[in-house]
Structure formats: structure tokens, C-alpha cells
Amino acid sequence: MSENSSTDMYLFKKSLKELKGKRGKGTELISVYVPAGRRLSDISQHLRQELSQSSNIKSKTTMKNVQSAIEVILQRLKLLKEPLEKGVIIFAGMIPRGGPGTEKMEVYVLEPPEPVKTFIYRCDSEFYTESLEDFIQDTEVYGVILVDRNEATIGTVKGKTITVLKKLTSGVPGKFKAGGQSARRLERLIDDAAHQFMVRIGEYSTESFMPILEEKKLRGLLIGGPGNTKNEFAEKDFLHHELKKKIIDTFDLCYTEEFGIRELLEKASDLLRDLDLMKEKNLIQKFFKELIKDDGGLSAYGESQVMRYLEMGAIDTLIVTEDIELTRVTIKCNNCNFKQEINVKTRDLYKFEDEVKTKICKQCSGSMYIEEEKDIIEYLSELCNIHNSDIVVVSTDTEEGSQISKAFKGMAAILRYKI
């Protein structure tokens, strides 16, 4: 099956993180953003003009590096097929690996998750990644209003992130036992204070959610809390009329602070099953239900077991945490073409590259070299594609995702059949 969108987004985020850490020796790193539908011949013409102007650069080393980067990008553009539905983003430049003389040309070609809108050419000491940040933002937002007689919490749920925007307290006094006119007057004052508190909640909600609604990113409003206060707030005209149209439902809750938002999400899970947070939670809970069975059920976990079962085609859904730091390295013999694939911790990759230079082939004692390095999630995604398995990359921001990361080294799976 086709690669899961969570894998695509993970790889995009990983590339962004790597690019943000790259630095050139001088002003010689090139960033090119090609808008969707733009003719590649126009882009190539612009780059050739930049190539010509680069001859004016005073430093010969910088001039040479800039020209090399532009030429690499021109070559990559020739390999692309039009039309580009989303456009393309290309980065190229000489990146130092250590001291002077260790620079190596690096090139990155990214297909953006959303269409590129504006052409950008930038030559700097670092790659221009600011526009990439917009692509990794979740576009759909749920507004949350938790309310009771004494306090309220206004927040958002965006992808996997819960954000508390405002906490309010009413100052409304509690019930009393006194009777007579004084009691009735006090009761009116309390009712008026409660009404004014609702008005404040409505004003802060409008201030918080209308900008999101105007950007067409507000998917809906969830209103919760103990007692009847939430229903009164939802039914009367405390909210802006456009926001009232976005109310999905009201929910009975025990809490009105951040824990109440989590309680609300649990109760609203059927309505929000498309939300990443709930999809991940439900999937991981399904895995744990299999795991706790006496025979382990249809569960697998850990790098060794998961890799073996995936290659057998026995995995239905592979769960990988986004913090897994492994690279799939293929080393090959210079003499007999013997190959070996190894998972290497990404932080140890440079050390492993040095070790390979002294490695001896097991079959003919020839020298070995690195043929390919690939992010482990990209590699696993390709295997899943071959074996018609699903792959889901989960965040460690959730309790369930953190459990997979810590207890199972970031890899778990639900099997198709018992092994």
C-alpha cells in the first residue's frame, strides 16, 4: 500500500531538522523554492543568471562553491517531470564535516506536503527553512471551552497538542441558607455575577477562536463541564453567532482545567476519531490489548522481532515512534559485491563510516564501502509497501507513544496472524 501520511510528515520534519542544523563556511548555501505549476525552464533561466552573477564574488573559494551548488540544482531540475502539482524545494551547498578541507557537497530535494506558493532563491551561510515551518503545522484546530459556575478554561486541540489559552475564575459566591428580602437580593446579585462571568467567557472565546475561524482552520467547538452551566452557556447568546454554528456537542465532565480537556477528548473520541491524538491512542491501546493476552496475542515488539516479522509479511500494522534514531546502512564489498545491511544508531554514524574503511569482507576478505544510508523509518515504510502493511509514526508527546518508545525501543506491531 502507499506510504502512510504520518511517515511522509515524519520524513519531512526530519529533513527540516537536519537542514536547520547545516552551516556553510561562507555565504554559499543555496535554497530554491519552486511554486506549484511554475515552468521549470523559467526557474533554470533564473538560476543561470545567478550563476553568471556569482562570478563577481570576491572570494574564489566561495565563488566556486556557489557555482557548484547552482550547477547541482540545475542538474536536479532536469530530472524532474512537469507539471509539479505541489512544486519542489531544493537545497544545495558545501557543508563542512570537520576542519578546513572537509567540505562536501550536499543536496536535498523535498516534495512539500502543501503547494509552494512563492518562488524563492536564497544564497546564505545557512539554508532558508523559514517557509518550511508553515508546512508542518496542523491545519485543523478544535476549540475547547470548559465551564462551571466558579471557573472556566479555554483551549485548543491541534493535532496532538493541547494548548490552554485562558483560565478564568468567577468570584461568584456559593449557596446560602438565610431567608427574607436580603436573601432574594443576594440571590439576584449572585445570578448577575454568574451572568457576567458567562459574558466574560464568551468574550475571551471570541477573542481566542474568531481569528482561527477566519483562517478557516477551526473545525469545531467542544463545550464541557459539570452541571448545567455548560448547557446554558452553549444555548444562550454568550458566544459570537459564527462560533455558535461551530459547536459540535456538550459533554458532562468532572473537571474544568487541563485534565478536563483530556477527559473531554476521551468522551468525544467517537466524534474526533479522525484527530491524530485519538487515532494514535486507539491504535496503541489495541496493541496493548494483544500484548497482555496470555500468549502475547497478535503483538510483536523490539527491533529484532519486528524486523523479522515484517520481512515475513506477518505484520498488519507497524507502530514506530518518531524519536527512533536509527539509520539503515548497506555496506558492499569492492571485490565480490557481497552486501550486508546493518541498523546503526544515527549519532554513531560518522564513527561507523570510519570503521567501514577497515572492515574486511566475510566472503573474500576484500575491502568494504558504504553503498547506501537510509533513515530507518523510510526503510521500514518501503518494506511495509512491499508487504501491504500499514505503518504509523506516533508522537512521544502522548503517554501511549512514550510507552512504546521507552518499553519497546520505539518499535511495536500488530500481526496478521499468530506466529
From Swiss-Prot:
It comes from the Archaea. NCBIfam families: aRF1_eRF1 (TIGR03676). Belongs to the eukaryotic release factor 1 family. It is found in: Cytoplasm. SMART domains: eRF1_1. Signal peptide: none annotated. GO terms for molecular function: translation release factor activity, codon specific. Heterodimer of two subunits, one of which binds GTP. HAMAP family: Rel_fact_arch_1. The gene is prf1. Keywords: Cytoplasm, Protein biosynthesis. The keyword Cytoplasm applies. This is Peptide chain release factor subunit 1. Its main location: cytoplasm. GO terms for cellular component: cytoplasm. Directs the termination of nascent peptide synthesis (translation) in response to the termination codons UAA, UAG and UGA.
